């Protein structure tokens, strides 16, 4: 998605937005972690385009200290660990470094679609923010996945699938 471009949040969001804008109809966005941040950002910027929103392990104000600590750890990890992200190590470090200032608190009121906020019971880095986010969005519901951590789609796929299907069945 960022081929030939700088690994920054701004570039990633621009590429994501361009993909979403290709759809003529309203869209339903579902994102996990960084994907949730991108989906939330898009729903804020394009409230009339997003029909529904699912945010898994979401943040609405980036935890600056946590991101900086994470980046410090990334510097000591081998390059091979980053293949799962689809980025090079330097790109992940760069991307995280550009996200520390993200803060959507003043814009959450622009999200007008139904939203499902999901977080794993053991996802200590995101659970508090996810619960808060659900309370700030006007038409939202929070669901905690039992026994799941940050990678809820891997750790609780059946429960997540059930929760998603129930939500999608109620989206008009």
Predicted feature residues:
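Short beta-strand/loop motif that positions the catalytic acidic residue
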Residues: 110-111, 117-119
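Active-site loop/oxyanion-hole signature of alpha/beta-hydrolase fold enzymes
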Residues: 1-28, 162
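Hydrophobic, aromatic-rich cap/lid helix
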Residues: 80-104, 122
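Catalytic histidine-centered segment of alpha/beta-hydrolase-like enzymes
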Residues: 148-157, 161
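Flexible "cap/lid" loop of the alpha/beta hydrolase fold
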Residues: 9, 40-45, 49-80
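Gly/Ala-rich beta-loop-alpha elbow adjacent to hydrolase catalytic centers
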Residues: 31-39
């Amino acid at each position: 998605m960022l081929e030939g471009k700088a690994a920054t949040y701004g570039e990633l969001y621009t590429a994501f937005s361009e993909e979403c804008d290709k759809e003529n109809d309203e869209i339903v966005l579902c994102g996990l972690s960084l994907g949730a941040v991108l989906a939330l950002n898009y729903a804020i910027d394009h409230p009339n385009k997003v029909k529904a929103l699912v945010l898994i392990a979401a943040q609405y104000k980036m935890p600056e200290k946590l991101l900086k600590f994470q980046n410090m750890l990334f510097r000591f990890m081998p390059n091979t660990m980053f293949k799962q992200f689809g980025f090079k190590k330097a790109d992940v470090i760069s991307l995280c470094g550009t996200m520390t200032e993200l803060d959507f608190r003043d814009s959450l009121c622009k999200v007008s679609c139904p939203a499902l906020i999901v977080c794993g019971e053991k996802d200590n880095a995101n659970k508090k923010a996810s619960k808060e986010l659900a309370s700030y969005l006007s038409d939202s519901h929070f669901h905690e996945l039992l026994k799941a951590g940050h990678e809820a789609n891997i750790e609780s796929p059946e429960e997540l699938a059930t929760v998603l299907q129930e939500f999608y069945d109620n989206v008009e």
